[in-house]
Amino acid sequence: MDPESVGYCNNPDFLHKGSMDELYNISKLTDDIKPVEEKWKLVPAFMKCRGLVKQHIDSFNFFINVEMKKIVKANERLTAENDPSYFVRFTDINVGSPTSTEDNLDSVQLTPQRCRLRDMTYSAPIFVNIEYTRNKQIISKRDVHIGNIPIMLRSSNCVLSKKTPEQMAALGECPMDPGGYFIVRGQEKVILNHEQLSKNRIIIEMDSKGLPSASVTSSTHERKSRTGVTLKNEKLYLKHNTFGEDIPVAIVLKGMGVETDQEMAQLVGSDDVFLNAITPSLEECQKCGVHTAAQALDYLGSRIKVFRRPYGVQNKKTKSEEARDILAGVVLNHVPVRRYNFRLKVIYLSLMIRRIIMASKDKSCLDDKDYYGNKRIELSGQLISLLFEDCFKKFQSELKKSVDQAIAKANRAENLDLPKLIRTDTITNGFTHAISSGQWNLKRFRMERSGVSQVLSRLSYISCMGMMTRIQSQFEKTRKVAGPRSLQPSQWGMLCPSDTPEGEACLHPDTIITMSNGQQKPIRQLKDGDSIITLDPITMEAHSTRIYSHFIKSSSQYGKQLLKITTITGKEIICTNDHRFLTSNGNWKQSKDLLLNDKLFLISSSNQLEFNNNNNENNNENNNDIIEILNENQLINQGVVPIKIIQELKSIELLPLLNNNEKLITISRIIGSIDKIGSNKQNEPIIQYQFNLISDFDQFLKDLQYLGFINPIYKLNEEQQQQQQQKIDHQQQQQQQVEQQQKSIIIDFIGSSFGYFIQSLLNEKNWIEKSNNQFVKKEFLSSFISNVNRIQFNIIEEINQQNNDSNFKILLNYKQQKQQQNEKEERAVVDHDNEIFNIKSLQILLNQFNVISSIDFEESNLIIINSSLKKFIDLINIKFNQKLNNQIIQIREYLNYINYNNNNNNNEEINIKKKDFGYFKKLKIKRNSFEIEIEKIEQLNYQDCPEISDFTTESDYHSMISNGFVSHNCGLVKNFALMSHVTTDDSEGPLLRLAYNLGVQDILLVTGEELNSRNAYLVLLNGQIIGIHNSPDYFVTTLRKMRRAGRIREFVSICKNKAQQTISVACDGGRLCRPVIIVDDQRPRLTQEHIEDLKDGLRTFDDFIREGIIEYLDVNEENDSFLAWREAAIQPWTTHLEIEPFTMLGCVAGLIPYPHHNQSPRNTYQCAMGKQAIGAIAYNQLTRIDTLLYLLVHTQRPLCQTRTIDLLNWYKLPAGHNATVAVMSYSGYDIEDALVMNKASLDRGFGRCIVLKKQVTSIKKHGNDTSDRIFPPTPNDLRQPKYGLLDSDGIAKPGELAQKGQILVNKYSPLNTIDATPNPELIPDSAYKSSYMGYKYDNPAFIDKVLLTSGDDEQLLIKMLMRSTRRPELGDKFSSRHGQKGVCGIIVKQEDMPFSDLGICPDIIMNPHGFPSRMTIGKMIELLAGKAGVLSGKFGFGTCFGGDRVENISKVLISKGFSYGGKDYVTSGVTGEPLACFIFFGPIFYQKLKHMVMDKMHARARGPTVTLTRQPTEGRARGGGLRLGEMERDCLIGYGASALIMERLMISSDRFTVYACKNCGFLGYEGYCQYCKSSVDISTIQIPYACKLLFQELQAMNIVPRLKLVDS
């Protein structure tokens, strides 16, 4: 052996060194690990390979180059129906470059900028190579155009791909633009990242009763379903929506083929803990009499929910066969079952049971509901891929129809030219519509989503970047969280901890929410655990869901504007400006983005009932006085109800029936709908119902299932039954179903538990009439009135012939029932002798709701008098008579419309013509038996509200019914961290083979004992159990070594869970992962040499991955690893090292200097305000014509930078100024964060911005060949100011100053656009009407640009860009980068400002009280760093967890002759004397926010008033004033300003002179008292008109207010 190779001990030179300490010093075994210098260089290297937006682009490229070809390959062949020998085969597909065809049919290259300006779609043609047969010959065609696809900017097919900055500039693009979005019809659209709950994974959580339950969301291409296993009374049950009740798991396992109890026990676990836990479930199986698989399937078949089939369509399968199919294909449908071999599914279900038992004994076995390893992210490529597959299959089906039609004609078949049959608009329109609307309605994939794409925010460069990295969680299964901003440890390094919403979207606390039981409550009265109605935004189907995280907070905490939205019928809601509403096109839209005349979805329902404090929260009788309406003894005493029926009613909690039972509301509705009741010869009760439509009967069945009658026994009316049993062919059957929809349906319930229950309940007299629950009465009334056979509901519309007005009258004709005898059934159906079915008692019930009616006993008519018509219409809400409900809804909204417009119109009452009523008929649509109305917005006003409230729902649909509006509840918005990456799907096959090669035993070959042995670890691949392994460490270590060696993909995750004894291998897409440095034996594999190679360009980030120096970890594998924060923190057990600490933040939070010194909410606030800061958006900002652009005139690079600013190149497009700030108190105008600003600084351009707004019109070509025209102004026109901007061509001149109402384009449209016109060019000018485009904004602006171009439809497009320059004024909002915003409180001349000994005057003075409560220490350090940077000529760095240290900054300040603490000697500008203390003085980067006084200020001296109250209108848009509210009034009272109160609340509002009687206190008329019949004691007084109106309305309610007059 070479002695030198042995080591230092054999070296003779070493022996002279002396001690062992020197030995260790030389060997460096005990040295600290030196940190690698400039390790942060790995971050820009990663950004080049992956980047923030690159995952969007890579995802789209993967679709274009790989997925698209796979989809075509899977659907390559079409065969004709008429001739099977004729086929079409798609052999290849490719996407070209973006092009457009002009008028001259030339194809020109499209650029993104051209599409933005011309409102075109930036798309490229899709070409396919095809083969098809013609005359028995195979014809090949190449590059056949089948449609266009929008191209993502900077993707491989984009013209910007691989372009240099110079080439980008030549194309009119900004080199800094990130790409990753689409341009559709001129709008920039981005497909957001969507967060979903990971499918096919078991989740163990606590249910509402505090017991563990397991749930799995199974997802395959065929079906999506949710399966649960719950624990009740120590027994385990399977829960699935196909079964009407929870099924004992032992019966399910038997149905799947597990024959013995011993085998079940072995599958779950042989330990005593598991045996004891499963024994009650096995015993229950025996009690149910289930011993074999056949018995189990029969049991399951009898519990299958009743799903409506068309009448006459019989199910050919038996109940047991149907149950077997449900177990195989619906329950846990992601687990494959081949030839009814349930072995895999049995093991999977056993694992769910085992984990529930473990969780019941040890709470640590519960899954964290927000654990991010259970989430998946969908990228644009995946969503576009689904969209293309759907469009391509539609295209193929249309092509197949065309081919079949062509082949059917012999003369055409021989000369068939297939390319001529191809329609290119199917795919083109499919893409364009989906991306522009954001709706992904793909029925073949059971996918219906809205809001998938959104308009890209261009408020600032960073707002664009922030939106590209946003994660939309609208469609996820939201989990319970401690609070809306709770952080999960699993999000570390994956999601930004700071960039969460500044505040949730919220509502006014008095907003009425519709509960799942039909009640309506103010949101302030809700509490966690309450159930509300939520709606699927696509199908409008109603679901019940619990709420949590309910809160009521001060609105001042959020700093958001509150909006009041009013519709054309007067429906109102107050919400924050980011609260989302469902619009008529199916999209969610924030309230601040709503416009007048936008249409919103509303749920039409009767007005909510008043809640008083005497009732409990459910508005039932007082809990202290609980009464039994029906109990077991009453039924036994009746002697007609079988014991079996009594037991069944007790099991579904309808016996005893108490007056506080929530089901009473549904019961009253069902009782009110009864048509006839009686009994047969066996004395069995017969309950008969009659419905107009099948859908009405479906609603009735849903109510029965809610009560617990899962499979109610009923039969059709005899006549209908005979019709249904006729044997008819398919077409006749369809026709019969259509006819059946038009006939009434009569249903009999004979001798069932439901029948006995109803009969017994009717024997208890007057319980509805005496009930204190108003909803019980209301639902009974609504159903009774809508009864098809008992009440004839007449809506009489009376038309005034003079003015064509419509008036309505309600007439209820009570039909007398007669006893009927049915000989065939040998039963008597008679009317039940009960007071409820009585027209007099109906009137009594109506009177309780202040609905006044009269009775005509001769005709049995009950007439609702006119004064109560609206109350009656608002009261009833019909569920089982859809046809009648539609009519009532139309009248209700019509009356609301009249009432609202009369109350808000200055003139006399408006006349609503009969044609206007037709408007409401058109607005109503019906979806899944829910009444939806679409209403236009009439007003959008800003409001003040001291409190706001909201909550989160547990369901998939985060929607609610609030004041009738379909709105969204609060949720989280998350953003990617800097180095997070989203995986794409990878093939499972190679990993499966590798797992078996590494010793995994096939799960199908394993017994129950082996499955749960101590050494056996279950191996799961993407959630599927594939086998077990007895050496888990070997398996995991080997797989990881192979990944680091590049033998398997770098994004494969391997995770060992010791508690559950599982090894999870994942290669599915959508997992968040991030790169970390591998550590071996306490030494990072990354060395300084590697960094030097990276700096020299010899290595890339991907090289480090391939060499096994860095690897990607997802959230699950992170849990199985130990990560060190820095090199100094490495321990013997450390496996990985972080690349850089600051990468835990996102791109927006990374701009904050020294964020680790700030209070956490401040960083969150800055993330929101940073996106609202005005700055530069792109290099091409002055050539764009966007809807709204804010530009800062002189942007500056911040003196205190961060690494993230360099990485994003934000310093090239900044948003703010370096303001010299003095932290001191100066006058009283700087309290509450207000700023004192230097007038000279504003004169020099500080905070000055440009607002650019677009106005567009087009010259349309109409169907009769006529078109719009632009007329030059006539000499008479030019005398009017509104025509003053027009040039000789009828278009306004650039550079002119436009005022509101002035004409910009003098456009005229033809009067006749329908009838054919022989010579459109010869139409006289008199045949045109003016349709000019005028300047529509309140603030004047200059015409900056005028663009004349044409779009996709080749129509002339005229765009005008309006420019206004704004300098800061009082009330404008500014913010630092630390979440401290403040308005400009006062602007002071420079000579009055304090100045330092160097003569420097501050630009801004801020109050020092802004620091202690906000705790923004980072802002102080930023001032020091900026000051040192100015003096030293270097930029300071305030990177998170790093940056320049305060000690070093202070040394620089001292070396330059300044105070180490940043304080200066300052002299007062007013007195010229030095201030009494040193002032903290230096530069801080300030942002100007988009919130400016000019956009929001409004006031009025005089203007329109409301007709009803004669008070001024409200809202800026309606010329309204500012309301002096209750709190303002109380403040004035406190100051004793009585004259001001009188002036504000009466003289300037609604002063009204009335005559009042001193004797009786009533109001008189024209100096005469009607009550006293005298004019002696009459006095004239002045009161507000609203007060006089209140007195009169109270008198109408029999409340008599009297005035006591005293001589002044």
UniProtKB/Swiss-Prot annotation:
Q: Which SMART domains match?
A: HintN
Domain of life, per lineage: Eukaryota
Zinc fingers, C4-type class: 1557-1572
Q: Which reaction does it catalyse?
A: RNA(n) + a ribonucleoside 5'-triphosphate = RNA(n+1) + diphosphate
The alphabetized UniProt keywords are: Autocatalytic cleavage, DNA-directed RNA polymerase, Metal-binding, Nucleotidyltransferase, Nucleus, Protein splicing, Transcription, Transferase, Zinc, Zinc-finger
Q: Which molecular-function annotation in GO is an example for this chain?
A: zinc ion binding
**Which PANTHER family does the entry link to?**
DNA-DIRECTED RNA POLYMERASE I SUBUNIT 2
Q: Which NCBIfam families match?
A: intein_Cterm (TIGR01443), intein_Nterm (TIGR01445)
Q: What is this protein called?
A: DNA-directed RNA polymerase III subunit rpc2
Q: Which gene encodes it?
A: polr3b
